[in-house]
Amino acid sequence: MSVLDLHALNALEKDARAGALADTNAQLEALSAEARVSWALENLPGEFVLSSSFGIQAAVCLHLVTQQRPDIPVILTDTGYLFPETYRFIDELTEKLNLNLKIYRAEQSPAWQEARYGKLWEQGVEGIEKYNDINKVEPMNRALKELNAQTWFAGLRRDQSGSRANLPVLGVQRGVFKILPIIDWDNRTVYQYLQKHGLKYHPLWDEGYLSVGDTHTTRKWEPGMAEEETRFFGLKRECGLHEG
């Protein structure tokens, strides 16, 4: 089979799929982030989408991908509990980069969820996972389906957490190709890119936040903390979008 045959890859077990993509990933590791985006647009199937949480370093991947695909749909899963600074940052970047923003939300409003389940994020790992399934995973699955996505760009980096340390440039997740063009970047490379292109960090960066999600499960970084400890009370790093 062709290693870029999405249907055939989806029929394989996870380990076999990774093996089938190993040679391609070895080639992609040697490319720049810009070249990885170009390669994906030329070799992977459309429709293409880009997801963003509009977090601390979100401007990097948003700028990187839209420089080559200006009209790519940008998927935001909005929980309704983002920081006010995040919503303003979304507006700012959407205008600055002329983003084709697609906002997806849970079918139940935040108030309805609290009435039905209570504050899920205060109910341990199981509650957090249920909250994430409702507010992140289901809306993302719906977005991928409605936008007919076959290739998904995301801005994950290996040095963000242990759960991301071994991710490849190219994989298959939720039935679509997933490409991570800045997977091997460090904080210095991110800073240099932002400076070069006149882009900003999320406003809360200057207040001591290394990672930003919902108001109720995000903490400022303090000396001695790992970055993943600033999210979900240190119980989880991933919100569910990038698992599986």
UniProtKB/Swiss-Prot annotation:
InterPro entries listed in its UniProt record: PAPS/APS_Rdtase (IPR004511), PAPS_reduct_dom (IPR002500), PAPS_reductase_CysH (IPR011800), Rossmann-like_a/b/a_fold (IPR014729)
Domain of life: Bacteria
UniProtKB keywords: Cytoplasm, Oxidoreductase
Gene3D superfamilies named among the record's database cross-references: HUPs
GO biological processes: hydrogen sulfide biosynthetic process; sulfate assimilation, phosphoadenylyl sulfate reduction by phosphoadenylyl-sulfate reductase (thioredoxin)
Entry EC no(s): 1.8.4.8
Broad class of enzyme this protein falls into: oxidoreductase
Annotated GO CC locations: cytoplasm
Keyword Oxidoreductase: yes
Pathway note: Sulfur metabolism; hydrogen sulfide biosynthesis; sulfite from sulfate: step 3/3
Reaction(s) the record says it catalyses: [thioredoxin]-disulfide + sulfite + adenosine 3',5'-bisphosphate + 2 H(+) = [thioredoxin]-dithiol + 3'-phosphoadenylyl sulfate
GO terms assigned for molecular function: phosphoadenylyl-sulfate reductase (thioredoxin) activity
Annotated compartments: Cytoplasm
Active-site residues (renumbered): 239 (nucleophile)
PANTHER family the record matches: PHOSPHOADENOSINE PHOSPHOSULFATE REDUCTASE
NCBIfam families: cysH, PAPS_reductase, PRK02090.1
UniProt family annotation: Belongs to the PAPS reductase family. CysH subfamily.
Function according to Swiss-Prot or TrEMBL: Catalyzes the formation of sulfite from phosphoadenosine 5'-phosphosulfate (PAPS) using thioredoxin as an electron donor.
Protein name from the UniProt record: Phosphoadenosine 5'-phosphosulfate reductase
Origin organism lineage: Bacteria, Pseudomonadati, Pseudomonadota, Gammaproteobacteria, Enterobacterales
